[in-house]
Amino acid sequence: MISIMDRSEIVARENPVITQRVTNLLQTNAPLLFMPIDIHEVRYGAYTLFMYGSLENGYKAEVRIENIPVFFDVQIEFNDTNQLFLKSLLTAENIAYERLETLTQRPVMGYREKEKEFAPYIRIFFKSLYEQRKAITYLNNMGYNTAADDTTCYYRMVSRELKLPLTSWIQLQHYSYEPRGLVHRFSVTPEDLVSYQDDGPTDHSIVMAYDIETYSPVKGTVPDPNQANDVVFMICMRIFWIHSTEPLASTCITMAPCKKSSEWTTILCSSEKNLLLSFAEQFSRWAPDICTGFNDSRYDWPFIVEKSMQHGILEEIFNKMSLFWHQKLDTILKCYYVKEKRVKISAEKSIISSFLHTPGCLPIDVRNMCMQLYPKAEKTSLKAFLENCGLDSKVDLPYHLMWKYYETRDSEKMADVAYYCIIDAQRCQDLLVRHNVIPDRREVGILSYTSLYDCIYYAGGHKVCNMLIAYAIHDEYGRIACSTIARGKREHGKYPGAFVIDPVKGLEQDKPTTGLDFASLYPSLIMAYNFSPEKFVASRDEAKSLMAKGESLHYVSFHFNNRLVEGWFVRHNNVPDKMGLYPKVLIDLLNKRTALKQELKKLGEKKECIHESHPGFKELQFRHAMVDAKQKALKIFMNTFYGEAGNNLSPFFLLPLAGGVTSSGQYNLKLVYNFVINKGYGIKYGDTDSLYITCPDSLYTEVTDAYLNSQKTIKHYEQLCHEKVLLSMKAMSTLCAEVNEYLRQDNGTSYLRMAYEEVLFPVCFTGKKKYYGIAHVNTPNFNTKELFIRGIDIIKQGQTKLTKTIGTRIMEESMKLRRPEDHRPPLIEIVKTVLKDAVVNMKQWNFEDFIQTDAWRPDKDNKAVQIFMSRMHARREQLKKHGAAASQFAEPEPGERFSYVIVEKQVQFDIQGHRTDSSRKGDKMEYVSEAKAKNLPIDILFYINNYVLGLCARFINENEEFQPPDNVSNKDEYAQRRAKSYLQKFVQSIHPKDKSVIKQGIVHRQCYKYVHQEIKKKIGIFADLYKEFFNNTTNPIESFIQSARFMIQYSDGEQKVNHSMKKMVEQRATLASKPAGKPAGNPAGNPAGNALMRAIFTQLITEEKKIVQALYNKGDAIHDLLTYIINNINYKIATFQTKQMLTFEFSSTHVELLLKLNKTWLILAGIHVAKKHLQALLDSYNNEPPSRTFIQQAIEEECGSIKPSCYDFIS
């Protein structure tokens, strides 16, 4: 360890000039620049805020901020009586406070006229956050309105009040300084901190990327930290400047000898315990500001912590890693080991992270960051994300080889493992830098006055709320008192829906269609109509009074939860002083972003003119990345703004505002719709914030006539289309200007504007939010390989390559330019042609074409995934019982996506000829690795019917034959269902396997129908023979004997019938057992005839048991006999059903035994003799199935010449 450089030494080596300057500043106590990375609060006793980060040269620094006032505000008239009353309330609750101050602020909810604009507040100061929180809770429960009432993260309030961002350069002034080892410690007061307004110098914070390698002696399993024999045998670490991918130093800590390398320092440890301690020691020497790994919050950190616990060294490890605070084990586990932190990936998805958060080092899981950047990514592996970015891939080293190298302790091979491990760490930093993750998050923190930790681990709405409060509390925005606590009744319901014009479905090949969109509709509406909580008027009388005084009001009304919600917002009429908080903030963000985008454009132009080898290229590239990060952060806040305004958990939530924005969106889209229609334009589709418009036919008259008068070649037609696109662009530019002027006249502002992005021609609308076409942006471009696609299922997450390919083929074929004089195939013809080729020529598809992905969410009712995971769990348990590896059936982490295919199962039928093999998706799913390993056949028909046909039906459901009657409400759903049914019949007509399966079902049904008729006939005769016994109550025994004799005589007379029936059953059973056709190389199921007969046999036993039950109920005199018979029949049926008679054949001993019972009770005269043989048979059966010889002898002895067979039983 001594030979490895620590952080200070590395900084001095890399930045000697800056280090000398920083040293001089420290010696003279001159102002210093400090970049905060991590924040920690001391909440007990006097409140203290600690910020950790680096100085300008890269030195590790701790800034301790003391004398921070702890307070909150309460709205109350500040006269002596009220102050005394407030004091008495606090005193009565034993709440210790320091002092009270009076101030005036504007309440955030409700409009107040000029003379009543500000309300009195009392600011209460405390010695600790504990007393502050007690007082806030008490006064809120008493009904008082509070403000500046942060109770969880008080540092956010400090940042807002001081206007001191926690993620950018801060200048330290008048500090006290104490060097301690690698850490430079500063103590300041809030007044000694100054926000550095310029971009500042290059940040020299240090990132440590790491990776661990683990081993398990149980092959094929994922190493589990809870298993004593599973170990971490290697940890590789590499450090970088935060903005660079060039490593500053690298270390490999290993338990197996490893050949030395010039790329890293190797530390050999004798045990896992020593390896973990060495990791902590090296961590402390480098003192990183950020620690990152790939999926380390799901695997690496839990493994390290659990193993440290097992070795009893977690406290020692934490205190080595933490340069600042030493803690006891219980405090570490409670406060610093974050076991379950829910990280939001997208609106629908979150992921659980676990990590050890040592003060001064911020943990970042690169996988989580990449998943947030690519929320719809089907693969979330390190290799997949590297491929998406075009970065160098990771090293390919299978786990079984890695474990083999570890077991053999081959130093040469272990060097390969070390290289694999250290490159994984390198790629984490590559991804962070490529995606500009840290600068992007920092800019969000600067705008929202939150920490870097907040920007990584909290959702966007939380940061918008904090930003609003930061704007509101300052004088230039009106000194508005804001609470962080949501109040009022939390209602759930739907706001007014968007204005939608149903699409004109079908393929448009004659006229271009242009999209006209509102630019940032909801933020624009907020700015235009002054939607802000402090501009809201709830009372109609107050609204009338304000209008009488000359105020302009915007009225909103909508229905919510079966009641009318209405209100008014005071308009600003373009007067800055009248603008509300929301419009002011949005306008400020918009102006900042506009300026940044202009600067970004200039920097981009410079980058194109300078070669990468130029000395100033890196600086220019860095500046471009920083400006881009700032404008992205502004965009995020503007887009998230309405979401927070409509969030009923937000302290800013106001129902009339949330619904008023959406209802105003409706109004304005209708306004534009009517304007465009009245101008003679056509509407193809409209939804929420956009209209798809076609120009009047007269616009194209001249170019169309020119084409008609030409030779009408394909070249002439292409020229016609080219000119139509140009004319549409010009017309839309004019129309767009007219629409914006019309909107300006209507709402009195220029904030609400529309713009057109592209002309689509040809274009096809298949449903709401579903369309595709060729997009022409600046110039005409008829490339069918670059389609503009919205909402079509081929871009849906988890979709197979098969569906994407078929859908793409249909769209590309339909987009080809075809002259009116040529045959223009209707879309249904194109779909059928592509579909037929896909179904008939199945050899064109590869295994990879059928791979799907889905997410495992245990709390979501995804039946297919739930069934599949249940099957995989059963497989794992079964394999574990036999001591076999089960990792190939491992369950993904909740929220994680997994890959699978649908495989073909054996076709089976029940007694009536109905399919009994499961058609449920969950029963057919298999992991990709398992399907590949066992070469399982793909169920192509399942993919066609369940995925492809739905997509294809979407293209053709506008056809007249699929349209619903007038009384159907959901016409699109009806047409889609009919179109899919049509295509299913089309596939059945061309798919050979489907035909063969249908034929098998027909054969089974015919066989069953014939046999069932015979069974019914013979059971009816049987019942008639015993009719006299059923009706005779005086002498039941004699009647039973007589009926039994009739039955024997009848049975002897039926031999010819039985023989005929036997042949028929044999014939049909043989037909049913013939193998069916096997299309596309996939074996079809072919159930044997004995399976059919087995089912019929069970049904017969059930029917005869009913008759025996009737006999039992009728004759007490033969109670013992029939009880014996019934019990044994029940026993045999139960045995048959539970054991399923795997060795069962028509002539098997089991059938003979059941037959013996049947014949014996019919021959009542010999029943008392047969009892002993039946008992002997049953005793024998309990041990092993009786031999055929034994049964045959017993039957011949007791029943004479009756020769049993399985077919006799049918009679």
From Swiss-Prot:
Signal peptide: none annotated. It comes from the Viruses. Sequence repeats lie at residues 1074-1077, 1078-1081, 1082-1085, 1086-1089. One of its GO terms (biological process) is DNA-templated DNA replication. PROSITE patterns: DNA_POLYMERASE_B (PS00116). This is DNA polymerase beta. The keyword Nucleotidyltransferase applies. It catalyses: DNA(n) + a 2'-deoxyribonucleoside 5'-triphosphate = DNA(n+1) + diphosphate. Residues 1074-1089 are annotated as: 4 X 4 AA tandem repeats of [NK]-[P]-A-G. The keyword DNA-binding applies. Keywords: DNA replication, DNA-binding, DNA-directed DNA polymerase, Early protein, Nucleotidyltransferase, Repeat, Transferase, Viral DNA replication. It comes from African swine fever virus (strain Badajoz 1971 Vero-adapted). Induction: Expressed in the early phase of the viral replicative cycle. Its EC number is 2.7.7.7. InterPro entries: DNA-dir_DNA_pol_B, DNA-dir_DNA_pol_B_CS, DNA-dir_DNA_pol_B_exonuc, DNA-dir_DNA_pol_B_multi_dom, DNA/RNA_pol_sf, DNA_pol_B_thumb, DNA_pol_palm_dom_sf, DNA_pol_type-B. It holds the Pfam family DNA_pol_B_exo1. Belongs to the DNA polymerase type-B family.
